[in-house]
């Protein structure tokens, strides 16, 4: 059994620090990936008044062996009031940047793309100055579904790569590495004003060279932002941690990513795809993009 090193130990969140955020979420009957996926940074993020909202219910139609979100083949129908409730949470929390993600909903014809668009539009009506990041599923490769999200014009579209190609069958059996790259490439080709983002987990048996190869593949499709963090086994029934990656290697990946041209490169043991996502606002100021002033791929 691999022993968790000291650099991965975080203080348990205290009620007074996270209570206000939890009260808002409970009052508005909203889910967060922070809670559903047992994120180790929940205390820090809730203390700062930030959260990553999980839309379309707490149950997923896929059963990825690394993920702590519950599986259901046929989850509940979508709630038409969810977009407005989410927007009210953003208002009550005073968020300048919001991250919206979802479970996979392969039971829906559009994979939930329209619900993403409705949530984006609701937040924009209530908090027009808030920047919006969406962390989306692959929609089973549907270009039409992706177009629905793009048409809502979030500032950032994130789709996580999760692991290296060699490990996809074991780690992400219902995903496809090529489909992930194609999704990111399509976003950039159709709406170059939208920043694209992806994330990787380390410690599942990948090599340093394999991670660098994935980073190069992501830059080849003009991915702007990359996060890399340590995989942590949520429960004994989930995939085991093969290795706890030293902080020095995360730092090497960070420097390598900057050298490859990622506009933002976040790599550390506790990094998660939405960790300190609000920092993307600095990137937007230094590399501004608007629909009327689209940038060609670098």
From Swiss-Prot:
Binds 2 [4Fe-4S] clusters per subunit. One cluster is coordinated with 3 cysteines and an exchangeable S-adenosyl-L-methionine. GO terms for cellular component: cytoplasm. Residues 46-263 form the Radical SAM core domain. Its main location: cytoplasm. The keyword Repeat does not apply. Signal peptide: none annotated. This is Lipoyl synthase 1. It comes from Gloeobacter violaceus (strain ATCC 29082 / PCC 7421).
């Amino acid at each position: 059994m691999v022993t968790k090193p000291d650099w991965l130990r975080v203080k348990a969140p205290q009620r007074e620090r996270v209570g206000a955020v939890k009260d808002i979420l409970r009052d508005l009957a909203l889910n967060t990936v922070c809670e559903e996926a047992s994120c180790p940074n929940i205390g820090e993020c809730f203390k700062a008044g930030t959260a990553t909202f999980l839309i379309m219910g707490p149950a997923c139609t896929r059963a990825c062996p690394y993920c702590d979100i519950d599986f259901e083949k046929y989850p509940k129908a979508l709630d038409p009031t969810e977009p407005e409730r989410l927007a009210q949470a953003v208002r009550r929390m005073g968020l300048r940047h919001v991250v919206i993600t979802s479970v996979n909903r392969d039971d829906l014809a559009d994979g939930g793309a329209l619900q993403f668009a409705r949530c984006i539009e609701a937040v924009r009506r209530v908090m027009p100055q808030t920047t919006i990041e969406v962390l989306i599923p692959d929609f089973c490769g549907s270009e039409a579904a992706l177009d629905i999200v793009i048409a809502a014009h979030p500032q950032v579209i994130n789709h996580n790569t999760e692991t290296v190609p060699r490990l996809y069958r074991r780690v992400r059996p219902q995903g496809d590495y090529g489909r992930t790259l194609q999704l990111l490439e399509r976003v950039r080709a159709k709406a170059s004003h939208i920043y694209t983002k992806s994330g990787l987990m380390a410690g599942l048996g990948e090599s340093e060279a394999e991670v660098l190869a994935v980073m190069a593949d992501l830059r080849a499709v003009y991915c702007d932002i990359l996060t890399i963090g340590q995989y942590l086994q949520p429960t004994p029934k989930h995939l085991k941690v093969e290795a706890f990656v030293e902080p020095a290697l995360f730092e090497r990946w960070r420097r390598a990513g900057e050298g490859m041209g990622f506009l933002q490169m976040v790599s550390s043991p506790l990094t998660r795809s939405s960790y300190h996502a609000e920092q993307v606002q600095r990137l937007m100021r230094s590399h501004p993009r608007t629909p009327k002033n689209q940038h060609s791929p670098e």
